[in-house]
């Protein structure tokens, strides 16, 4: 079992204060901003070169990533965890969501973080006192994959109330990489959201504004699903298609995405959308915090949550 106190993550930390859940960590300082990511229009804004690249390679890249889903999807990651529960996982991922936003990281980085976390949990028992450290370690590994400027070790550890050392973080990073065989490039919900949104824009008479709003709302719904263990068995491509379908429905779009592009049977898509609808209804106060104001204004049923 990987623990902090036993030194398997490094040296025993010098505890300056009692270590609690992630929610007890200090308030996040001012958020870094990624240029062009805070508006709905930015969700689908692409250069002519990028659009042409999608036309040339988008479908083959999609088939390649979809073919890898089963290989990277963890199976019951908590089955071997005597100390980590679904509730603890929910709290950790719910904490990582604002942390990744604070650092200005992409949704792709968050998806890879949760995938790395779950795949490691499926292979290795983790002690409760090491779980938060595992979360920031997974975030660090994911950020190194897809971000130009990943957060520093010092920045990440500062969010853990000084409970862990740099050496512990480095040691756990090595353990995670070894257990996963350095096999990290998992297909993500983020990738499939972008792909289906681009497919939508290629259709005749596509409404770019509707596509942008649906993409952003679907992204918020997908973030909520990452924290809910009930969605662990859903493939990323299915969650992406279901989130976009639900977003179109909630926004009352006249030209919704044709969900047949996902290749999933109608009944499977319907089940996924129903589960996501329940998730949204249970998180009416949280979802607006994940969305820009201009999208919230188009969702009357969400305005009370702001």
Cite the ranges covered by each PLM segment.
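Acidic, serine/threonine-rich low-complexity regulatory regions at protein termini
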Residues: 1-306
